[in-house]
Amino acid sequence: MDKNLKKEIENRRTFAIISHPDAGKTTLTEKFLLYGGAINTAGSVKGKANSKYAVSDWMGIEKERGISVTSSALQFNYEGYCINILDTPGHQDFSEDTYRTLMAADSAVMVIDASKGVEAQTIKLFKVCVMRHIPIFTFINKMDLEARDPYELLEEIENVLGIKTCPINWPIGSGKRFKGVYDRDTKKISMFQAVSVGGAKSAAETTYDLEDEAFKGEVGDELYDQLMDDVELLDGASEPFDQDLVDKGELSPVFFGSALTTFGIETFLEHFLKMTESPLPRMSDIGLIDPITEPFSGFVFKIQANMNKAHHDRIAFMRVCSGKFDATKDVFHVQSGKKMKLSRPQQIMAQDRKVIDEAYAGDVIGVFDPGIFSIGDTICTPGKKFTYEGIPTFAPEHFCRLVALDSMKRKQFMKGVTQIAQEGAIQIFQDYNLEMSEIIVGVVGTLQFDVLKYRMENEYSCDVRLEPLPYGHIRWVKDPATDLNSIKCPSDTKRVKDMKGNPLILFTNEWSIRLLLERNEGIELTEFKKN
């Protein structure tokens, strides 16, 4: 076995960061990059014309609004590890792209605002992590601002998300009285010191032992006594740390800190790297594929067109699952049955692209896509032929009719909407019985409608109108051979088909779904489509 290959793969960690809007996910991502030396200063991310943009935000609409619409892949080195972060959108409306990004991660970091606790978007993303049984780490952020009781926050995580928690460190006070954290592993106290917002790494932290008189003098009797009670209670009553349960995604290690002031980031990184594993074997149609002993293979989890308007290019993001990718060698695209060289392989950080010659299991690379790749495609070494488990298509929740304002631009219109749909940010449907019918667009989050309109007008020079539709649910009919015309549908439903001709039904509410199931014995409907 190639010892260098083994070492490279064992040093890799690939994780996604999930959170609700404004919980501090982008700030945390940037502070990680600061520690790895990937960037020099962190810009606080707001939608102001004169502010710095986050390193992971690149699309025009993202710059205008100061939000992350797409999911970016960022790589940095830290303490001998090569870390790949999959950054997911954190604004109110996210896309199916966000769910798919989690299919490429080996673990997830869940960022929670200490004043708000578990919020709606966190719950949606958490469900995908649970579906995949990946480890989930919790970073409770903004402890230097007004925060809820830490016990209350842990209880909410356990009750709402159904996962056990194990605090690795514990806060001493919060808001203006936030003094630092107690590390339950090392039994040391790190005193809170704020670093300026755009500053580099945190200032040298003052550390104390629990019994130090100097520490007691600095925090005062009330906070000291509270901490002593907390330590006793945690040691006696909290869930003990169990690496096996962490690996199965049943126990979440919890950390407290403040990303904006760079407090608690280094501690979190060090514990996280010890508690996570290098890339694990992945399931395919021929069984598990070992990341170290098997030659190169990977799968496409995201496609993005026009990442650089000057290039009019289309990039396929690929997660390398096994072996070493060598840019000089041919690869085999399983779905088309073709041998090819991957053109211009690169690592992408916002607008910066670095052309690479090689990549290892765990890495995420972008490759030029001439229009042959689809989400979920498998790419492997010639001579091998298998497919990784498909990435599910998730049911959209919002629907619009898309109309081209200039009927002479029908060709441009269809090209634009089809390309954007192939990237997976939107899904398109047509009437089940009519061939050249209206285009119905379905999205997971409504901001994708704005993104679609913006991109159709700016990238495809095609003015469009979006007409909202009353539907709030869509279901695939499990048997694709079903004739929808034979199904007794309630009057407020609509029969449609997707790009692949699969039959679906649009519903206005859940009552209509129940009514259809009652009227049609034996029919099976599903919320997501396995690909």
What is each of the regions a protein language model found here?
Residues 1-531:
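Structural and coupling elements of P-loop NTPases
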